[in-house]
Design a protein with these regions (language model features):
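Beta-strand/loop-rich accessory regions of lumenal/periplasmic or secreted enzymes
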Residues: 4-294
Length: 294
């Protein structure tokens, strides 16, 4: 019961961010390509019951109370979740009047302990400009207002903006996670996170890098995610012209991204450097969501 049933956008894919002042030029390309109106379209869905690796705290390397009881058996490879449900979906990131922005093969594995492992193979159409971000967005209960994360903090950090941050475990309230900008724009991100926990009112949601499977390369094993927990949606921060116009959504807005593109300096300087753009033709994104009792 972490995710609010009253929310309009309980869970969705996202590629849009509220444009920063430095996005003032590229935002016109993003909007022309429909990034601000993009949504996920399913082309094929298959489900099956599987026996797969359990995603318990020991496997994830984090602490926290389980939500419900773990149902597991032991084998030579360790704990195995019994009767996990695997949902495979062929999807597209689409917008009106344009071809699919990206194709996605998505697998959700719902384990007996309540954890959900997510793996996405993403193939971006090279005809489109680089993405502002790619990940998932969830609207959690407003009462889940306490955040702890392991990543670059305590100041906001991005792939090209992190010299004032360091790796560690940090805690803050959701109201403290954002940066109050006079002109609302993207803010409050934390780069290279290995886990994050959002909690309140007796429940918590743990977010951990990886889906429990063996990575194909050491780089994949070490890759963290970008994490954000704010009072406002990206759409609201895009709409508002001044900070006093912002309307809190009434939920805790959580974003977990494979990556956000960098901030750059294109309001008065050069375009964002290629190494800081999310423009890879193909990438894999894997995280695990685990409900807990706080």
């Amino acid at each position: 019961h972490c995710i609010s049933s009253a929310a309009s956008d309980v869970y969705k894919r996202q590629i849009w961010r509220a444009p920063t002042d430095n996005d003032r030029n590229v935002r016109h390309e993003w909007e022309r390509c429909g990034y601000d109106r993009a949504y996920a379209r399913a082309y094929d869905v298959q489900t099956r019951t599987v026996v797969s690796s359990g995603i318990g705290e020991a496997a994830l390397g984090v602490d926290g109370g389980a939500y419900g009881e773990e149902t597991a058996v032991e084998d030579a490879e360790g704990p195995m979740a019994v009767n996990a449900v695997e949902i495979k979906c062929s999807m597209g990131a689409v917008a009106p009047t344009v071809q699919p922005i990206a194709r996605m093969d998505t697998t959700w594995t719902v384990h007996a302990d309540g954890s959900v492992a997510l793996h996405m193979n993403v193939r971006k159409d090279p005809a489109f400009p680089f993405l502002p971000r790619f990940g998932i967005h969830m609207q959690l209960l407003k009462s889940m207002s306490n955040v702890t994360y392991c990543g670059l903090g305590p100041n906001e950090s991005y792939v090209d903006k992190r010299r004032a941050s360091w790796h560690g475990v940090f805690s803050a309230s959701v109201s403290q996670m954002g940066e109050r900008e006079i002109k609302p724009q993207e803010n409050g991100n934390h780069h290279d996170c290995s886990w994050a926990r959002v909690q309140g009112d007796g429940v918590a949601l743990m977010i951990v890098q990886g889906d429990g499977s063996q990575p194909e390369s050491p780089a994949e094993l070490l890759r963290g995610f970008d994490f954000q927990a704010l009072e406002y949606t990206a759409a609201e921060m895009t709409r508002a012209r001044h900070d006093f116009e912002l309307q809190p959504s009434g939920f805790t807005e959580v974003s977990v991204d494979y990556m956000q593109s960098g901030i750059g300096s294109n309001s008065c300087g050069p375009e964002l450097l290629p190494q800081y753009r999310l423009d890879a033709p193909e990438f894999d994104f894997a995280i695990t969501l685990r409900p807990q009792l706080a």
